[in-house]
Amino acid sequence: MVLKEIPTENITRPLGRNEVIGLLFRLTIFGAVTYFTIKWMVDAIDPTRKQKVEAQKQAEKLMRQIGVQNVKLSEYEMSIAAHLVDPLTMQITWHDIAGLDEVITELKDTVILPIQKRHLFEGSRLLQPPKGVLLYGPPGCGKTLIAKATAKEAGFRFINLQPSTLTDKWYGESQKLAAAVFSLAIKLQPSIIFIDEIDSFLRNRSSSDHEATAMMKAQFMSLWDGLDTDYNCQVIIMGATNRPQDLDSAILRRMPTRFHINQPNVRQRKDILKLILENENVESAVELSEIAKQTDGFSGSDLREMCRDAALLCVRDFVHQESPEEDFIRPIRQEDLQRAIEKMKKSKSAGVHEAFMQVPLD
């Protein structure tokens, strides 16, 4: 009965032009409101939103500093660009590294020279710069300093890549960030992608690896292979590690140029001590050769810490003297360095594990 009361012409008649426009307008408004509402909700629940905004501001600032303003970057490239280091702001040069003259000379010949003198090597594929360089050896021996000095002296853009930058909770985002690393480096070439503690990121693959991590590593290596096929590409991936045995064999294949940065010998320790104490107030009677002989097994960072302890002894004597007859801190003496050596040896021989085991846990 109800259907009979509805005029059939109102059901079958076509919509008018104004009605169609009105319907499309309402659908457009509804779609826009739905889109922005969902986008706002996703941004609201994203715990990294604030960090992403700050990273974008930092990236834009760094891009202006290095003189790159007309290059368009994607959202993912902006996230990676936040880890750019301006070569002009890096204070590290070859003169700040002592005891590694042979490594520095080989780096200059095999990595820097083929890029700075490209016109001399254009006709040879064998003389092209390597796409992967590995610095390995004990901690505190100058691996990171060498990487920064290489970028500084060669004028490369330096991307200090943190593995945590490539991790994202959304599926597929890590792969996009990995791709952005290489696309950004190519846009900014010549450039160095430096990965410190590379073994924590590209270690041996196993069946227990998470699916997202395995996919990210696979894509990273695939993009890396793309650098090898493009002989005009001026992008170098440089890694540093204390545990080269933990690196995946596929990664080692992609890093054919390797430098072993070992603990310094007596001559190298003397050179390092000269560099550390070069601008310090030191007595002329100090025998650095003797100090170098007594510091067997010390790394470069150990020697710096030892010299700092010796300098602090001079400060303590000045502060605690009963009748301050002098208003200046005395120079570093031989006995100050001897005491600092003994302190460093005790801390090195104590053993961190043994010290922690003596701490009560309840």
Swiss-Prot record:
Q: Where primarily located?
A: mitochondrion
Q: Which UniProt keywords apply?
A: ATP-binding, Cell membrane, Membrane, Mitochondrion, Mitochondrion outer membrane, Nucleotide-binding, Peroxisome, Postsynaptic cell membrane, Synapse, Translocase, Transmembrane, Transmembrane helix
Mitochondrial intermembrane topological domain ranges are 1-19
* PROSITE patterns noted in UniProt: AAA
Q: What is its EC number?
A: 7.4.2.-
Q: Does the keyword Cell membrane apply?
A: yes
As for membrane topology, the entry says: Single-pass membrane protein
**Per the record's keyword annotation, is Magnesium included, yes or no?**
no
Q: What are its GO biological-process terms? A: anatomical structure morphogenesis; extraction of mislocalized protein from mitochondrial outer membrane
Residues where ATP binds: G137, P138, P139, G140, C141, G142, K143, T144
- Output the superkingdom of the source species: Eukaryota
Q: Where in the cell is it found?
A: Mitochondrion outer membrane; Peroxisome membrane; Postsynaptic cell membrane
Residue ranges, Cytoplasmic compartment?
Answer: 43-362
Q: Where are the transmembrane segments?
A: 20-42
Q: Looking at the UniProt record for this protein, which Gene Ontology cellular component terms does it annotate, in alphabetical order?
A: mitochondrial outer membrane; peroxisomal membrane; postsynaptic membrane
Catalytic activity from the UniProt record: [protein]-with a C-terminal TM segment(out) + ATP + H2O = [protein]-with a C-terminal TM segment(in) + ADP + phosphate + H(+)
- Which molecular function terms from Gene Ontology are attached? ATP binding; ATP hydrolysis activity; membrane protein dislocase activity
Q: Which InterPro entries match?
A: AAA+_ATPase, AAA_lid_3, ATPase_AAA_core, ATPase_AAA_CS, Mito_OM_Translocase_MSP1, P-loop_NTPase
| CDD domains per the UniProt record, alphabetical | RecA-like_ATAD1
Q: Which family does it belong to?
A: Belongs to the AAA ATPase family. MSP1 subfamily.
| Annotated function | Outer mitochondrial translocase required to remove mislocalized tail-anchored transmembrane proteins on mitochondria. Specifically recognizes and binds tail-anchored transmembrane proteins: acts as a dislocase that mediates the ATP-dependent extraction of mistargeted tail-anchored transmembrane proteins from the mitochondrion outer membrane. Also plays a critical role in regulating the surface expression of AMPA receptors (AMPAR), thereby regulating synaptic plasticity and learning and memory.
Q: What name does UniProt use for this protein? A: Outer mitochondrial transmembrane helix translocase
Q: Which organism is it from?
A: Danio rerio (Zebrafish)
Gene name as annotated: atad1b
